[in-house]
Amino acid sequence: MKRNMAVLFGFLFFSLLFAAAGYAAEMASKCTLCGMNIAGNENTAYEIVYMGGTEETYCCPHCGLYMHTTKKDSVKSSRARDFISGEWMDPAQMTFVFKSSAVPACSPSWIGFGDKTAAKKFQKGFGGTIYSYEEALTERAKMPKGMEMKGM
């Protein structure tokens, strides 16, 4: 009887351990601001490393720029993905298109481009307003944290 109880408790312990590990892995693959999955949004990802060494991944510049503006004094470094190539870049060297008809992640969309010419071509097809990095930070700081929810 004691052996059966020990086996049962051992099974329950390991089941809870595996469930917790699975939950942690799932949460690590979600945007830390809005909770959107990072998988599927790889070309819009935005990462910030804070002074204490904590690294946060956001699904897109909508979330990343917001956190960058609200925690600017604690930001050590950041990087964002170029929407076209998917390459990591310094956001300060990027051009951003705001509120285009294309919404790959959050809405209103902020989409980063490593090349201003590519941003202009994208804008011709999908609309939106072009901002430099500094302009994007200034504009994003004026906006609320969350997303626009159509029809709500």
Residues covered by each model-derived region:
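Bacterial N-terminal signal peptides that target proteins for export
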Residues: 1-9
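Bacterial N-terminal signal peptides
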Residues: 9-19
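Residues immediately within or flanking Cys/His clusters that coordinate Zn2+
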Residues: 28
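Short cysteine-rich clusters marking metal-coordination/redox-active sites
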Residues: 31-34
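Cys/His-rich metal-chelating microdomains
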Residues: 37, 66
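Short, non-ligating residues that shape and space the ligands of small metal-coordination modules
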Residues: 40-41
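Beta-edge loop/turn motif
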Residues: 54-64
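C-terminal partner/receptor-binding element of secreted or periplasmic proteins
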Residues: 114-152
